[in-house]
Amino acid sequence: MLVIPAIDLKDGKCVRLRQGRMDDATVFSDDPVEVAGRWVEAGARRLHIVDLDGAISGEPRNAGIISEIVARYPDLPVQVGGGIRDDDTVQVYLDAGVQWVIIGTKAVSAPHFVNDLCLEFPGHIIVGLDAKDGKVAIDGWSKLSNHDVIDMAMHFEQDGVAAIIYTDISRDGMMQGVNVESTVKLAQAVHVPVIASGGVTNLDDIRRLCAVSEEGIDGVIVGRALYEGTIDLAEAQKLADQ
């Protein structure tokens, strides 16, 4: 199982939000490229980058910084989300060297978009499903839809997505522990890799996910816990490799 450090970008800085709220952001660094380097040195095998300004505006706002990170660390596979609403943006990121592009809001509002992208860019499309109480959230988590998260995951599996990132937004950034039960439930319903996200606080969370990783959980995204020092990346990855 991969332990994937998260870099969330807002106004060119590396921040963490609580429960996805843009008005509740903690700035951890003014230099996201340096932060990426720190995770590379600690042994990161993949990086998760989100353009938060892009997620709100609907178009990339931190693409320059993301391109810089990818250029600086060409051997590090990177997945990027936030504000990706058309195939031109996908093309720009893939041309820059990004490995996977994450589709969030538009996957829910226009599901055929994911199907089109999977045909155009096979193997490079990941869907991010952010849910609360089993329902999918959209627009930077500011709205809850009527869509059931498992139904949507099964739909995107048919489209040919490379993976599904599942975030329990009631836990995200709250350091309350990962929602293992709902993550397993989703992973059991599909055959594509599921990446867990939201609420990872300490090594116990990593252990709990490792114990069920055979259900189809291939990775876990860790944010605030790395920045606040409650998880050491090298230690967490060593645990996940056992």
Curated annotation (Swiss-Prot):
Pathway: Amino-acid biosynthesis; L-histidine biosynthesis; L-histidine from 5-phospho-alpha-D-ribose 1-diphosphate: step 4/9. It is an enzyme of class 5 (isomerase). One of its GO terms (cellular component) is cytoplasm. Its EC number is 5.3.1.16. GO terms for biological process: L-histidine biosynthetic process; L-tryptophan biosynthetic process. It is found in: Cytoplasm. The keyword Isomerase applies. GO terms for molecular function: 1-(5-phosphoribosyl)-5-[(5-phosphoribosylamino)methylideneamino]imidazole-4-carboxamide isomerase activity. Keywords: Amino-acid biosynthesis, Cytoplasm, Histidine biosynthesis, Isomerase. The active site is at D8, D130. It comes from the Bacteria. InterPro entries: Aldolase_TIM, His_biosynth, HisA_bact_arch, Isoase_HisA-like, Isoase_HisA-like_bact, RibuloseP-bd_barrel. It catalyses: 1-(5-phospho-beta-D-ribosyl)-5-[(5-phospho-beta-D-ribosylamino)methylideneamino]imidazole-4-carboxamide = 5-[(5-phospho-1-deoxy-D-ribulos-1-ylimino)methylamino]-1-(5-phospho-beta-D-ribosyl)imidazole-4-carboxamide. Transmembrane segments: none annotated. It holds the Pfam family His_biosynth. Its main location: cytoplasm. NCBIfam families: 1-(5-phosphoribosyl)-5-[(5-phosphoribosylamino)methylideneamino]imidazole-4-carboxamide isomerase, PRK13585.1. HAMAP family: HisA. Belongs to the HisA/HisF family. PANTHER family: 1-(5-PHOSPHORIBOSYL)-5-[(5-PHOSPHORIBOSYLAMINO)METHYLIDENEAMINO] IMIDAZOLE-4-CARBOXAMIDE ISOMERASE. This is 1-(5-phosphoribosyl)-5-[(5-phosphoribosylamino)methylideneamino] imidazole-4-carboxamide isomerase. It comes from Thioalkalivibrio sulfidiphilus (strain HL-EbGR7).
